[in-house]
Amino acid sequence: MIIGIDLGNKSRNSISVVDGETLLEWSNIKYDPKTTTTWEHRKKIIKQIRAYIEKYNLTKDDYIIFEKVNMFMRGVNSRLANIMSLAFIQATIINEFSDVISISEVNVMTWKKVVLGNGKAHKEDSVAFIEEHYPQVDLNVIVEHKRKETEYLKDDDTADAICIGLYGNMVDKKKLDEHLVNYT
């Protein structure tokens, strides 16, 4: 079984639980700097992952998979603040769960190539894939603004988290083990 995590950015993180091609659960955890600290946000992520591990009795034979933090995205330097935010979340996950479950990282282009058939696929492609194959997942998001019109968006973070979970079930365990990041 795979827990797929899209670290998104500091304000949004999505988690999926996938067994083979079966999507068992998914969640989206939002961060609001007005009501919580980044540490409290990381604790919410850990709490959700722990709940999934306990509910499905996951062990070292199962995996958490998250995206590798990239220093460059499409030839452009990533912002240091973004890199640090993602690295803190990864470090927290590794610290909390290394003794419990296998933890592997995957390059964004790698999972996109395996799941979507194109390593350079865009967010819209993962959304379209999930809407086609998992119509029970509502990816519609309404964002209300004080000074602008309401926006109607798609939750590409949840789509990516599900695709990452699917990736873990589509590749050989040896491939996942090559990219383990557990400290134990």
Residue ranges and their predicted role:
Residues 1-184:
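Phosphate- and other anionic-substrate recognition elements at nucleic-acid/protein interfaces
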